Amino acid sequence: MQTLKAKYNEQVRPALMQQFGYSSIMAVPRIEKIVINEGLGSSKDDSKAIDKAAKELALITLQKPVITKAKKSISNFKLRQGMPVGVKVTLRGERMYVFLEKLINIGLPRIRDFRGINPNSFDGRGNYNLGIKEQLIFPEITYDMVDKVRGMDITIVTTAKTDEEARALLQAMGLPFRK
């Protein structure tokens, strides 16, 4: 089976070039990066929860996550400036394609009642946002490892100028959009 990067170069790029009539191969949209963010919400007071979330995200993405900190103090949320509020990873290059392949072929099919991803989650600039409710859909995370089920936000940043181009790119890459 060919990798996602090879599929992009050999099949997706020429198809998009023909579909949208690009004059240069460099004008064809490509995936720039994937950002995975896991906000911890109520467990922000527990430092072990942050370490656990970082460890799980590192297992899933094969890259050490960055701990995100609060920018401002908000008294209603009992939040102080500089307190850790989540973890995030930015994937580029080969790791990005490996993660996307894992998400498409293993992760998404394991979601309960999965009928495809929402086609309306584009941001108007060619980027796609996807929310996942539990980290158990990835094979690296076993049920015994999980102390609390956490979700994550996945942002796929593309070089596409419009949502239509980005959707064509992601659909050609194999993301299963809902009809």
Curated annotation (Swiss-Prot):
UniProt KW keywords: Ribonucleoprotein, Ribosomal protein, RNA-binding, rRNA-binding, tRNA-binding
Gene Ontology cellular-component terms listed: ribonucleoprotein complex; ribosome
Keyword hit for RNA-binding: yes
Protein's GO biological process: translation
Pfam families to which the protein is assigned, alphabetical: Ribosomal_L5, Ribosomal_L5_C
GO MF assignments: rRNA binding; structural constituent of ribosome; tRNA binding
Disulfide bonds: none
Record-annotated membrane-spanning stretches: none
Self-association state and partner proteins as the record states: Part of the 50S ribosomal subunit; part of the 5S rRNA/L5/L18/L25 subcomplex. Contacts the 5S rRNA and the P site tRNA. Forms a bridge to the 30S subunit in the 70S ribosome.
Family: Belongs to the universal ribosomal protein uL5 family.
Known role: This is one of the proteins that bind and probably mediate the attachment of the 5S RNA into the large ribosomal subunit, where it forms part of the central protuberance. In the 70S ribosome it contacts protein S13 of the 30S subunit (bridge B1b), connecting the 2 subunits; this bridge is implicated in subunit movement. Contacts the P site tRNA; the 5S rRNA and some of its associated proteins might help stabilize positioning of ribosome-bound tRNAs.
Record-given protein name: Large ribosomal subunit protein uL5
Organism from which the protein derives: Deinococcus geothermalis (strain DSM 11300 / CIP 105573 / AG-3a)
Gene: rplE
